[in-house]
């Protein structure tokens, strides 16, 4: 029986510690192919490259692993992998990460990590985005390996509904072992931005975005609650942004003319 084919992507770039950890774990589960950005692409969301060149170069960073570095975005990496690198072979699983930093709650909309996974879901492929709530470039991923393997194995064995991707976040290293896995909803939280006005050495004005993450959702069924209480959070996500619950109300209440 042939090994599962697993495509690995990320947004922190091919040189990150997180992707190296993910490749290590996925190599225990199947045949791994890597297509990742050649430089950090954090916060790129679902951007794709249009009207500009895309470059793809083979990489020897991971001995025994077929790997490529791409000049484009995380979503570009998935598209190039499917249509060029894999040459018609269909991955059994696409995994993205492990991101250096949280992609819980509203961050999923800005996340290049999750956009790579969502792009795979758009292609009808099972996909998972993994993130660690630690922004340090040298973050310790050792405590999440077993959970990454467990979750990926579940998807490989049992599958996942088409159009759905899993957003998995891990607490940073803590003094006690992680308590387990919580399947939960996305918290209603947001980033409260502020912009620092600064001047470069030539006296030209520029702005630097700063701010803080604000979670005012007190629910104990959210990803933010799970992470704050020592659990791995798993949120099933859909790329269908339709507010289905409002379709009937708007058709009833809004006085549009219907043919």
From Swiss-Prot:
<keyword id="KW-0378">Hydrolase</keyword>
<dbReference type="InterPro" id="IPR002828">
    <property type="entry name" value="SurE-like_Pase/nucleotidase"/>
</dbReference>
<feature type="binding site">
    <location>
        <position position="12"/>
    </location>
    <ligand>
        <name>a divalent metal cation</name>
    </ligand>
</feature>
<protein>
    <recommendedName>
        <fullName>5'-nucleotidase SurE</fullName>
        <ecNumber>3.1.3.5</ecNumber>
    </recommendedName>
</protein>
<keyword id="KW-0963">Cytoplasm</keyword>
<dbReference type="GO" id="GO:0008254">
    <property type="term" value="F:3'-nucleotidase activity"/>
</dbReference>
<dbReference type="GO" id="GO:0046872">
    <property type="term" value="F:metal ion binding"/>
</dbReference>
<comment type="function">
    <text>Nucleotidase that shows phosphatase activity on nucleoside 5'-monophosphates.</text>
</comment>
<feature type="binding site">
    <location>
        <position position="99"/>
    </location>
    <ligand>
        <name>a divalent metal cation</name>
    </ligand>
</feature>
<comment type="similarity">
    <text>Belongs to the SurE nucleotidase family.</text>
</comment>
<dbReference type="Pfam" id="PF01975">
    <property type="entry name" value="SurE"/>
</dbReference>
<keyword id="KW-0479">Metal-binding</keyword>
<dbReference type="GO" id="GO:0005737">
    <property type="term" value="C:cytoplasm"/>
</dbReference>
<dbReference type="GO" id="GO:0004309">
    <property type="term" value="F:exopolyphosphatase activity"/>
</dbReference>
<feature type="binding site">
    <location>
        <position position="42"/>
    </location>
    <ligand>
        <name>a divalent metal cation</name>
    </ligand>
</feature>
<feature type="binding site">
    <location>
        <position position="11"/>
    </location>
    <ligand>
        <name>a divalent metal cation</name>
    </ligand>
</feature>
<dbReference type="GO" id="GO:0000166">
    <property type="term" value="F:nucleotide binding"/>
</dbReference>
<dbReference type="InterPro" id="IPR036523">
    <property type="entry name" value="SurE-like_sf"/>
</dbReference>
<dbReference type="GO" id="GO:0008253">
    <property type="term" value="F:5'-nucleotidase activity"/>
</dbReference>
<dbReference type="InterPro" id="IPR030048">
    <property type="entry name" value="SurE"/>
</dbReference>
<keyword id="KW-0547">Nucleotide-binding</keyword>
């Amino acid at each position: 029986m042939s090994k599962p084919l697993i495509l690995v992507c990320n947004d922190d770039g091919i040189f990150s510690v997180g992707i190296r950890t993910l490749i290590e774990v996925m190599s225990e589960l199947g045949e791994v192919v890597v297509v990742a950005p050649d430089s950090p692409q954090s916060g790129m969301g679902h951007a794709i490259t249009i009207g500009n060149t895309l470059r793809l170069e083979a990489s020897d960073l991971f001995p025994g692993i077929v790997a490529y570095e791409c000049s484009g975005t995380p979503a570009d990496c998935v598209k190039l992998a499917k249509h060029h690198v894999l040459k018609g072979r269909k991955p059994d699983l696409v995994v993205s990460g492990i991101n250096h930093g949280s992609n819980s709650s509203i961050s999923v909309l800005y996340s290049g990590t999750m956009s790579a996974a969502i792009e795979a879901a758009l292609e009808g492929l099972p996909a998972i985005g993994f993130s660690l709530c630690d922004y340090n470039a040298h973050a310790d991923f050792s405590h999440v390996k077993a959970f990454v393997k467990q979750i990926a194995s579940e998807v490989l064995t049992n599958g996942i509904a088409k159009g759905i991707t899993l957003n998995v976040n891990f607490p940073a290293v803590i003094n006690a072992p992680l308590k387990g896995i919580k399947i939960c909803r996305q918290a209603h939280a947001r980033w409260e931005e502020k912009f620092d006005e600064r001047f470069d050495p030539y006296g030209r004005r520029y702005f630097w975005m700063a701010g803080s993450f604000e979670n005012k959702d007190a629910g104990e069924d959210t990803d933010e609650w799970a992470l704050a209480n020592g659990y791995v959070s798993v949120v099933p996500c859909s790329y269908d942004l339709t507010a289905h619950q409002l379709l009937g109300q708007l058709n009833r209440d809004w006085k549009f003319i219907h043919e």
